[in-house]
Structures are given as C-alpha cells and as structure tokens.
Regions:
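Active-site helix of classical SDR
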Residues: 30, 67
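Active-site loop-to-helix junction immediately N-terminal to the catalytic Tyr of the SDR YXXXK motif
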Residues: 57-63, 77
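C-terminal helical subdomain
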Residues: 91, 106-143
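Short, flexible catalytic-loop segment of classical short-chain dehydrogenase/reductase
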Residues: 94-104
C-alpha cells in the first residue's frame, strides 16, 4: 500500500501504517507459507515487492520504497536459507499497474492496465525466476537504469 507521507512532517502514524502493511504483513505471510513448504519439502514462495524498492525515493514514496526494499531483502534472505532445498523463492518487482487501489491517481509513465499487468505477473510467476521485473518491458531496463542513474535524476522520474 502506498499511502505514505513526507518524512519529518508529522505523519509518523500514516508512514508506520504503510510500513506495517507492506513489510510486517509480508513477513507474516512468508512465515506461514515457508512453514508449510518446509513441512512438505516443496513449494514456491512468491514475494511481491515494487520497482520503487530499487532506490530511495523522495516525498510520499520514501516509506513505501523502503518497505518494499525490506520485502525484497526478506525474500532474498529466505532464498539464501532455502538454496539447497526444493523450495523456490521469487521476488517480483511490478512497475505501474492501474488497479482499483490507484484508479483515482493521475496516469503514470509506462503504466499498464490491470489485465495486462496481471497477465505479465502470472507469466513471470510461472517461470519461477529468482527476480522478475513486470511487465518486463520497459521495467527490466528501467530497473537497471534506476540502480545506476544519479539520485537527482531518479527523483525526477519518480
């Protein structure tokens, strides 16, 4: 959930709720799923992060991006622990997908509709990758760019 606010503006409770929803909820779900997967010695844990997780982002996105980065690192830690098991762990980094949750927001660059986004998510998940950027075009090259571009330029793109 991306309902964060700017840091240092008296919005701690809203930012905490964003962090709890995005990270603590994912942690609880991972705990439950991995327990089941360990018991059956198989499974595929799919963790949904965000393209926003790739860099620190300004303003209302700071807490959202940080919580999604935490989710991605949680998945990587779980994957590291399960490397020599039949349990797979995938981290999915969706770009902008228009859904009910954000239907009132302004249209964003490279945004796809819900149907296109869902098809891309399913296609990525079925391949059981370690990481996937969804939809792959343009988010795979955008992800690479986000990691190497100067922060000032990333801020303008966000």
């Amino acid at each position: 959930v991306g309902d964060g606010r700017r840091i240092g503006k008296g919005n701690f409770e809203v930012n905490r709720a964003t962090a709890e929803t995005n990270f603590i909820s994912a942690l609880a779900q991972c705990e439950a799923a991995v327990e089941i997967f360990r018991a059956q010695n198989k499974g595929h844990l799919v963790v949904i992060s965000s393209m926003s997780a790739l860099r620190g982002l300004p303003k209302h996105l700071s807490t959202y991006a940080a919580s999604k980065a935490a989710v991605a690192h949680l998945a990587e830690g779980i994957r590291a622990e399960l490397l020599d098991t039949p349990i797979k762990v995938s981290t999915i980094f969706p770009g902008y997908i228009r859904t009910e949750m954000n239907e009132g927001a302004k249209k964003l660059p490279f945004e796809v509709d819900e149907k296109t986004g869902c098809k891309a998510l399913v296609k990525a998940i079925e391949k059981a990758p370690v990481k996937a950027y969804v939809p792959q075009w343009p988010w795979l090259p955008m992800g690479i760019a986000m990691k190497i571009l100067p922060l000032k330029l990333v801020n303008k793109l966000s």
